[in-house]
């Protein structure tokens, strides 16, 4: 059975977790074994806990009114998911599925371990600030494949 390890920063009811929810339901119905690593927040991804082939791993992540706290929490999650990823170091044929630009820690770990790293790119990083542009650059360096939600996004990437 093929194994997919999926990383999504914030479980909520916004667009990217809704798309991810549909994709993972479809893959689990086809018999893929999926480990989903996401936040403990209540969100659409909670529906996947009833899927036969989906196992969920959760961490604490919250936004704050203080931008410094938010970035520190974000950095903590990147270190945590980077370290968490190494539980798959000896597993063959594992795909690391990175939903959005934000989970860069597990993408880096996957690349270091020689895993296939697939990004699902939802954001328009080039319309946002330096932080997102940096994440988009890192995505292009780390990804084996990039799934874009639009041709507009694809055309803004150097790695096609």
Label the predicted regions.
Residues 5, 73, 84-103, 116-118:
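Short N-terminal targeting/anchoring amphipathic segment
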Residues 143-160:
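A short, active-site helix/loop in glycosyltransferases that binds the activated sugar's phosphate group
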Residues 6-14, 26-72, 153, 158:
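N-terminal strand-loop element at the rim of the active site
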Residues 9, 61, 99-101, 121-124:
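Histidine-centered beta-alpha loop that forms part of the nucleotide-sugar donor binding/catalytic region
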Residues 43, 77-81, 95-113, 128:
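An aromatic- and histidine-rich active-site surface loop
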Residues 17-25:
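A conserved mid-protein helix/loop that constitutes part of the nucleotide-sugar donor-binding site
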Residues 69, 87, 118-144:
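A conserved, positively charged/aromatic
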């Amino acid at each position: 059975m093929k194994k997919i390890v999926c990383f999504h920063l914030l479980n909520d009811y916004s667009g990217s977790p809704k798309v991810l929810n549909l994709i993972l339901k479809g893959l689990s119905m086809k018999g893929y074994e999926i480990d989903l690593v996401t936040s403990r927040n209540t969100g659409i991804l909670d529906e996947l806990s009833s899927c036969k082939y989906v196992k969920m791993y959760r961490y604490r992540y919250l936004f704050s009114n203080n931008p410094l706290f938010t970035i520190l929490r974000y950095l903590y999650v990147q270190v945590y998911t980077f370290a968490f990823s190494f539980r798959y170091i000896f597993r063959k044929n594992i795909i690391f599925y990175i939903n959005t630009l934000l989970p860069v820690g597990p993408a880096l770990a996957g690349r270091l371990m020689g895993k296939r790293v697939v990004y699902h790119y939802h954001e328009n990083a080039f319309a946002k600030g330096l932080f997102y542009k940096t994440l988009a650059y890192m995505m292009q360096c780390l990804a084996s494949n990039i799934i874009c939600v639009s041709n507009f996004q694809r055309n803004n990437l150097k790695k096609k």
